[in-house]
Structure formats: C-alpha cells, structure tokens
Amino acid sequence: MSVKIRLARGGAKKKPFYQVVVADERFPRDGRFIEQLGQYDPRQNPSMVTLKEDKTLEWLNKGAQPTDTVRRLLRTQGVWAKFKQA
C-alpha cells in the first residue's frame, strides 16, 4: 500500500476548494482517505493554506509521498524544510 499526501477537491463548479489528505494511491481523488491534514483555498488572495504541521511531519516520516502540488504548499509553509532537517 503506497500512501500519498494529496489534494481532494471540493467546492462548487468553478469555485474549487481543496483538502490536504493522506490517502492510498489506489483510492479516487475525491474518495476515501486516511486522515485530513489541512485545507487549501486558491481563490483567496493570497491563497489560504492551513496545515496540521505535527501530523504532516508524522506522515512524512512514516514514508508518505507528497504530490508535486502538495510539496510546493509544504515548502511555502516551511514544513518541507523541517522534514529535511530531521
């Protein structure tokens, strides 16, 4: 079972809102997930990102692989640097 940290889309048509979730890569994008780590709203200026930093670091240390978009969000929040230092 390969676990990914990725975005699950929500919101209305043309008004996306995303949840940062941990999910098995075999599950559908907006389907079942293991744990919710935060939220991302790209429509706000600047984009709103909230993360549970401790849980995110815990999953990264367990071997969960973030998608490219989530990795970019982790870098902007400073979580990726903390993960690399550990």
From Swiss-Prot:
Gene3D superfamilies: 3.30.1320.10. GO terms for molecular function: structural constituent of ribosome. GO terms for cellular component: cytoplasm; small ribosomal subunit. SUPFAM superfamilies: Ribosomal protein S16. GO terms for biological process: translation. Keywords: Ribonucleoprotein, Ribosomal protein. InterPro entries: Ribosomal_bS16, Ribosomal_bS16_CS, Ribosomal_bS16_dom_sf. The keyword Membrane does not apply. Transmembrane segments: none annotated. It holds the Pfam family Ribosomal_S16. Belongs to the bacterial ribosomal protein bS16 family. This is Small ribosomal subunit protein bS16.
